[in-house]
Amino acid sequence: MNPIDIAVLVILALFALAGLYRGFLTSLFNLGAYLVSILLALLFMPLGANGIRSSESLYNMMLYYTEGSEYITNAEYVRADISSISSQELSDIISNAHLPYPMAKEISENIATEAFADQGVTTLGDYFNQTIVCVFINILVFLAIFALVRLILAFVINGVDYAWSFPLLRSGDSLLGMGLGVLRGMFALFLLFMLLPIGLTILGQFELVQALVDHSIFSAFFYRSNFLLALMPGA
């Protein structure tokens, strides 16, 4: 168990205690607010991402900081046309790149479908650049919209609870609230782990950070099996 695992357990414990204290109904509404916030973030993410792409200066700045082609270990492949690279070569290149999740999957899909052909993008290096910056932008926009909607819903829920006070169940209210608190904590962890590919992309391949992730018990679930990251488009 490493620091990431300890942090995960602490977060789950805090959410469990919050659910225990707040009770079933408040915890249920808060969990519902998470789900609504996620759905709205997914719905409006393309609009926000297009807004960023339409700003040339902002988009170029993000392209500069992500610089996906640096993950290609063989410089000869950076300028190679994707049509000249075999599927086995591509598989080896992506495998050796040690890309943050879900970059490898999105790059493979974009190359297979030639997703950026209409923009005149043909080289492997540019496909790495464009795909990684698109995933990067989509994650940022998704998290920003989620945070905004969640904040608004939190004010509404807390205001209603303060004005009328949600009733308690006759039995098991606190325990059910604690269970919902743990579930909400899991959603919160999925959201927090969405920051990991952003950090790894900007900071580069730090061996210490990568080692912590690789040896974490919980990262296999909250990071590599993150259903929210899997929903982030790469184009």
What kind of region is each of these model predictions?
Residues 1-235:
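Alpha-helical transmembrane segments and their juxtamembrane interface "caps"
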